[in-house]
């Protein structure tokens, strides 16, 4: 997809603060420091649309962006950072679950994992949420440039087993550095957005 515009719309915490649901939404979810912002920036060809941070747990809001005035990208707060309080962890969980439960314009969740790390309990909880609410999702394994091809194949298989990913479920390897997987992700998004809105 040719990107002609990419704009930050607003940040929100709870459903009453969300922007109007006038466009199909693609949400980006994953643990802290997994590379969500870098993935969004690479997909739209902008360096600083989604703010990146070396401090895990910094993003504590739901950030909405409009792409080409046709799609909304939603950057969900990262989870699983050990140094935040239990109350903050609880708020993050409630914030993300409220979005997944309430947002009828949500078309797909990009479920992001670091290919070098095994799925955490929080990752498994997110998967369970998505399954419970019957939300379509795509696994994207980031930082693929950090491993050799053989290591990538091995780690991908291990992650699939840990997630109990069914045969045929899409898993795309991605690198912000090399842009590996960028076109594959866009192909999935374009195919998905031709489908009717989730009921």
Q: Language-model segments: what does each one mean?
A:
Residues 1-83:
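Conserved G1/Walker A P-loop phosphate-binding module
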Residues 22-23, 43, 86-89, 124-128, ...:
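Short, glycine/charged-enriched secondary-structure capping and boundary segments
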Residues 58, 71, 78-81, 116-118, ...:
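Conserved nucleotide-binding/hydrolysis micro-motifs of P-loop NTPases
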Residues 43-47, 100, 163, 189:
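Hydrophobic aliphatic residues
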Residues 3-15, 146-199:
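Canonical P-loop GTPase G-domain recognition
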Residues 48, 61, 88-92, 119-122, ...:
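Helical mechanochemical/support elements of P-loop NTPase systems and associated helical scaffolds
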């Amino acid at each position: 997809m040719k990107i002609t515009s990419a704009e930050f719309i607003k940040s929100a915490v709870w459903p009453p603060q969300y922007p109007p649901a006038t466009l199909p939404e693609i949400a980006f979810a994953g643990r802290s420091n997994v590379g969500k912002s870098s993935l969004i920036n690479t997909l739209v060809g902008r360096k600083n649309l989604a703010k990146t941070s070396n401090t895990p747990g910094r993003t504590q809001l739901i950030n909405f962006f409009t792409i080409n005035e046709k799609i909304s990208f939603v950057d969900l707060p990262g989870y699983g950072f050990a140094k935040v309080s239990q109350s903050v962890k609880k708020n993050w969980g409630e914030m993300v679950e409220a979005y997944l439960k309430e947002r009828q314009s949500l078309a797909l969740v990009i479920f992001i994992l670091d290919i070098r790390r095994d799925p955490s309990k929080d990752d498994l909880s997110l998967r369970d949420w998505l399954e419970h609410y019957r939300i379509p999702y795509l696994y994207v394994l980031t930082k693929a440039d950090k491993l050799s091809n053989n290591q990538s194949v091995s780690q991908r298989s291990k992650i699939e087993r840990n997630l109990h990913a069914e045969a045929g479920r899409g898993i795309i390897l991605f690198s912000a550095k090399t842009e590996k997987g960028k076109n594959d992700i866009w192909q999935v998004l374009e195919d998905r957005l031709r489908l009717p809105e989730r009921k």
